[in-house]
C-alpha cells in the first residue's frame, strides 16, 4: 500500500499577506521625502501632531489619522486607524502610508516593529510641556513634510505668544494663585488626579494657578483624605460627553470633594481635553482661556 504525500502550502495570515502585497507594490518609502509633496501619503498619530499638519497647510498630505486627532473638525473625516497607544499593524498598513508622524508613546512596540520592517518612515515628535517643546514639535513636523521655513515661522510666533502668556501668569503673586486639582476620572467614586510632570500640571502653572497635588508624578488615584487635604480652590476637568462626563453635580456628591473650597463653592472648570492638554498650535489661547476662567478677564 502506497502512502499519498500531501504537500500543504503555508497559509498566509492577513497581516503577512497585506505586508507582502504592500512591499511588492513598492508603496512604502524608506525615508521622509525632502521637499514639499502634493501626494496623500502621511499618517498622523496624536492630536497635536495633526493640528500642526493643518496649521502648516499640509492637510492634503494626510491619508489617515488616529482617534485622538479630532481638531480641526475636518480631520475627523479622515480614516481612523485607532487609538495611538493601541495601534494594529493591519490598520496602519491598510491606509498605505509612506510616512508616519507620531507623538511619543505611540504603539504598541510590536506594531512599530512591523511598520519598521515594512520600510515605512516613522518620525517621532517629542512631547514637552513648554513653549520650546511646542516649537520643537512644529519644526520637526515641518522638516518631515518639507516645509521647514514655514514651520520655523509658525513655531516662532507660537513660542512668542506662549511666553507672553506665561509672563503675565508669572506676575501673579504666589499667595494669590488658586490651588487647582485636575481630575481625570471619578470612576467608582475614586478620584484619579494629576500630580507633577503632566500636561495638566504644566498648563495650570502657565495659566497662573498652582497644582494642588505635588506629592507624586503622573496620574494616580487618591484617597478621600488626600483629596480633602489638598484643599483645591478649583477642580479642572476635561469636557466630555456621555457616561464619562464629570459634572459639577457629580463632583459635589463625592465625600472627598464636598469639604474642599472647590466643593463648597461649586468651582469646576471644564475644557476640551485636546485644547487644554495638547500642547500644540492653540496652547497660548488655551492658557489665556484657563487664566480667565480662574481669575476673570
Where are the predicted features?
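Bacterial N-terminal signal peptides
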Residues: 16-28
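Short helices/loops that flank or line small-molecule/ion binding pockets
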Residues: 90-96, 118, 223-231
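A short, structured surface patch at a secondary-structure boundary
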Residues: 40-111
Amino acid at each position: 500500500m502506497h502512502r499519498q504525500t500531501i504537500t500543504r502550502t503555508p497559509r498566509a495570515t492577513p497581516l503577512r499577506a497585506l505586508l507582502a502585497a504592500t512591499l511588492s507594490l513598492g508603496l512604502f518609502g524608506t525615508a521622509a521625502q525632502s521637499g514639499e509633496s502634493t501626494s496623500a501619503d502621511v499618517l498622523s498619530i496624536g492630536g497635536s501632531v495633526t493640528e500642526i499638519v493643518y496649521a502648516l497647510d499640509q492637510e492634503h498630505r494626510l491619508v489617515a489619522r488616529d482617534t485622538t486627532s479630532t481638531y480641526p473638525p475636518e480631520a475627523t473625516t479622515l480614516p481612523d486607524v485607532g487609538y495611538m497607544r493601541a495601534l494594529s499593524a493591519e490598520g496602519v498598513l491598510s491606509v498605505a502610508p509612506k510616512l508616519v508622524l507620531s507623538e511619543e508613546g505611540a504603539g504598541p512596540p510590536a506594531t512599530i516593529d512591523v511598520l519598521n520592517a515594512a520600510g515605512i518612515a516613522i518620525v517621532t515628535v517629542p512631547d514637552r510641556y513648554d513653549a520650546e517643546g511646542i516649537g520643537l514639535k512644529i519644526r520637526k513636523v515641518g522638516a518631515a513634510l518639507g516645509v521647514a521655513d514655514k514651520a520655523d515661522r509658525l513655531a516662532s510666533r507660537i513660542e512668542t505668544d506662549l511666553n507672553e502668556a506665561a509672563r503675565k501668569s508669572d506676575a501673579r503673586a504666589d499667595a494669590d494663585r488658586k490651588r487647582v486639582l485636575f481630575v481625570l476620572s471619578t470612576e467608582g467614586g475614586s478620584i484619579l488626579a494629576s500630580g507633577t510632570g503632566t500636561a495638566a500640571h504644566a498648563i495650570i502653572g502657565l495659566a497662573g494657578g498652582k497644582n494642588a497635588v505635588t506629592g507624586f508624578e503622573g496620574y494616580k488615584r487618591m484617597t478621600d483624605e488626600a483629596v480633602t487635604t489638598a484643599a483645591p480652590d478649583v477642580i479642572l476637568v476635561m469636557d466630555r460627553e456621555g457616561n464619562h462626563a464629570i459634572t459639577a453635580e457629580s463632583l459635589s456628591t463625592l465625600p472627598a470633594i464636598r469639604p474642599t473650597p472647590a466643593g463648597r463653592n461649586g468651582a469646576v472648570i471644564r475644557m476640551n481635553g485636546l485644547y487644554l492638554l495638547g500642547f500644540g498650535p492653540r496652547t497660548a489661547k488655551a492658557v489665556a482661556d484657563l487664566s480667565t476662567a480662574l481669575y476673570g478677564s
